[in-house]
Structures are given as C-alpha cells and as structure tokens.
C-alpha cells in the first residue's frame, strides 16, 4: 500500500507498510505458531485476509488548529498536529464528510481543544460508516455542554450537506487526559443506532458499543465461527464478552439456548434489537461482567465462546471453565499472547482448530479463532 503520509515521515501507525501482504501474513502466522509452541494443534486453517486499503469503517480524529482552520488527525508527542484526512485506510466516502465538517466547525463555533493551554471545546471527531447502507454515525467529543445550543442550531446545514449522517451525538469528556470519550452521550438525532448487516445477520452500532473496524474480515470471522459451531452438537451456548452479539447471533439456531454477556449496556441494547429482528426467542443478552456471570452459574453449557479484550479472560475465569468443563470452548482473540496464556490454564482441553484473521493490515496485530475440545 502506498501512503504519502508514511513516505513523508508524518505518520508511522502502519509500521509494516513496507512489507507485502503475503510477507505480513507469514510473519503473523510465525508469531502465532511461536506463541502456541508446545500446545498440539490438530488443524491449522489457512489465514484469512481482506483489502489492504480503504477497509476501515471508523475514523478517530483529534481536532486541532483553529475554529476557522481546523485540522483532523493526530498529535505527535511534541504537540505537532498531523492531518490524516487522506489516510489510505479510510474509504473514499469519508473525504466529503471531512470536507463538510471543516466549515461546519466554524459555523457552530466549536473551538478545537488546545492541549497545551487546556482551552477550547472540540476534542475529537468519531466517524463510523455502515457497509450495509452507507449510513454514518458522527460523534462530537466536547469538553463540556457549553456549545451544545450552537451545535444544535448549526446541525440542519450539516445534515443538508451530508444526508448519510443518520446518528449524530455529542459526547462530553471533561478531563484533561488523552481519553477518547466520556460517559455522557447526548443524542442530536432521533435515530440512535446505525444499521449494519454481516452474512444476512442484522447488527446495530451504538455510540458506546464496540464494533470491529474491518467489516470485510470481521464478517468472515463471524461466518467461520458459525460454521464451526454448526459442526458441533451444541444445544446450549454462552457468548461471553459478546459486544453487540456478532458471534452469538451468527451461531444461534431457533432450537439453541444462548446467553450473551457484555458489560456495556449500549452493546446489549444492540444485541437485543438484532435478536428480536431475527425472531430468536431463546437468546438472552444481559449487561453483566462476564467473569462474575460465569462463576455464579450452576449449569454447564455445551459450548462457551469468549471474545475478551486484549487482556484475555484471565486465570479466575480459566480456572472456572476448567472446573465447569463445557465440552467445547471457542476463543476469539485480538491478542494471541494472552490467549496462549489462558489456554495453558486449561490443561484438560486440546486445540482442535486455529485460524488467523488479518484484521489489522500493516501492523503486527491480528485476530485469531481457536476451537478447544475437552479431553
């Protein structure tokens, strides 16, 4: 992939950009083999990759500069701003949004936040696009509610310029720290969730719910999990750290009992909406801590699917799963190092199948799906 920002030395986020996609896949595969060394793997499935550019469905832009000439991108450690509007990871559909937002910021009087001076209001712009219908969600991350009235008054102009903006919010992040969002979300549109669809499964994206940033590869990840579960005798399943329900909604059948657990209420609202659309009445999604939920249960499902954050599921949940001993565990991980550590805490399971998904091209990161079977 060619990137003018990288060539000019202005951005180094894609550290592997000089390697071919095949070289990147080989290096990631070797890393996964190294991490699972000593753990017998029955089947290594071929890695899955997607487009090398224009694949991201989300932009997270630091706003700097002035209200008349805002700049969207990032700040170097010395405070130097870098404009990332031309980043080749973004689809072409993002460019007109960025172009319209620059004069809009002046119209709304949203002074960019100055980190050094601790002054200003607009900290970040968070833009998400649905691959299903091209609809977009835009979040203005503000220091306070001071400019809300002005923002609301200026919105009709922006929506006339960009009718694809279906969900618009103001997120309030008052602290002087590099934190992307605060707890308060104020909706500026009637619509509160963005419609998405993977493999004919309806999914919803809300402002404070996690959603994969590479929809092409994510849809193949969910489809693969569905295929694996479909080959197993599963009537009762847990989907832990379930997010908006992507895995569970793909794997569920009308006859299957499935419980999805995720700590974020916004994500659970999305999952419940999807389950209702699919007419799956035996799916139950709850906003709880996954480890606390699992360790409080007295029943044992046939399969437990886990999709934890980078820290992994941790030893307490590993110990409980080892004791509870479901017949199957599917582990989806964005950090193979912590996944390998967790699997070593499950000595009564063998690895039947492993597949790497190149969710993050041009970086060392990748997603991996692993099927564990009880000995």
Swiss-Prot record:
Keywords: 4Fe-4S, Iron, Iron-sulfur, Metal-binding, Methyltransferase, rRNA processing, S-adenosyl-L-methionine, Transferase. InterPro entries: 23SrRNA_MeTrfase_RlmC, MeTrfase_TrmA_AS, MeTrfase_TrmA_CS, SAM-dependent_MTases_sf, U5_MeTrfase_fam. The keyword Methyltransferase applies. One of its GO terms (biological process) is rRNA base methylation. [4Fe-4S] cluster binds at residues 3, 11, 14, 87. Its EC number is 2.1.1.189. Catalyzes the formation of 5-methyl-uridine at position 747 (m5U747) in 23S rRNA. The keyword Iron-sulfur applies. GO terms for molecular function: 4 iron, 4 sulfur cluster binding; iron ion binding; rRNA (uridine-C5-)-methyltransferase activity. This is 23S rRNA (uracil(747)-C(5))-methyltransferase RlmC. It catalyses: uridine(747) in 23S rRNA + S-adenosyl-L-methionine = 5-methyluridine(747) in 23S rRNA + S-adenosyl-L-homocysteine + H(+). HAMAP family: 23SrRNA_methyltr_RlmC. S-adenosyl-L-methionine binds at residues 212, 241, 262, 307. The active site is at residue 334. Belongs to the class I-like SAM-binding methyltransferase superfamily. RNA M5U methyltransferase family. RlmC subfamily.
């Amino acid at each position: 992939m060619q990137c003018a920002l990288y060539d000019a030395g202005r951005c180094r986020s894609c550290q592997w950009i000089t390697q071919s996609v095949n070289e990147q896949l080989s290096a990631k595969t070797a890393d996964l083999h190294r991490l699972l060394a000593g753990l017998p793997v029955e089947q290594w499935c071929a890695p899955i990759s997607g487009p090398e550019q224009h694949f991201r469905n989300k932009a997270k832009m630091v706003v700097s500069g002035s209200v008349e000439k805002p700049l969207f991108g990032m700040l170097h450690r010395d405070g130097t701003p870098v404009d990332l509007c031309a980043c080749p990871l973004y689809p072409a559909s993002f460019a007109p949004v960025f172009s319209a937002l620059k004069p809009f910021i002046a119209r709304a009087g949203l002074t960019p936040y100055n980190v050094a001076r601790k002054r200003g209001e607009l900290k970040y712009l968070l833009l998400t696009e649905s691959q299903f219908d091209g609809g977009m969600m835009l979040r203005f991350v503000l220091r306070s509610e001071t400019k809300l009235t002005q923002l609301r008054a200026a919105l009709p102009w922006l929506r006339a310029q960009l009718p694809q903006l279906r969900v618009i919010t103001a997120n309030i992040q008052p602290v002087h720290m590099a934190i992307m969002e605060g707890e308060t979300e104020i909706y500026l549109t009637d619509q509160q969730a963005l419609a998405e669809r993977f493999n004919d499964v309806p999914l919803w994206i809300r402002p404070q719910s996690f959603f994969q940033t590479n929809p092409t590869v994510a849809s193949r990840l969910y489809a693969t999990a569905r295929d694996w579960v479909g080959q197993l005798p599963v009537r009762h399943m847990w989907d832990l750290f379930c997010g908006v329900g992507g895995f569970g909604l793909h794997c569920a059948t009308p006859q299957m009992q499935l419980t999805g657990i995720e700590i974020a209420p916004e994500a659970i609202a999305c999952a419940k909406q999807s389950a209702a659309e699919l007419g799956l009445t035996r799916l139950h999604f709850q906003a709880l801590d996954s480890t606390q939920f699992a360790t409080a249960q007295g029943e044992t499902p046939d399969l437990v699917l886990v999709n934890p954050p980078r820290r992994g599921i941790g030893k307490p949940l590993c110990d409980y799963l080892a004791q509870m001993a479901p017949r199957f565990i599917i582990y989806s991980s964005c950090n193979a190092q912590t996944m390998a550590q967790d699997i070593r805490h499950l000595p009564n399971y063998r690895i039947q199948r492993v597949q790497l998904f190149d969710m993050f091209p041009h970086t060392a990161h990748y997603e991996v799906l692993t099927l564990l079977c009880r000995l």
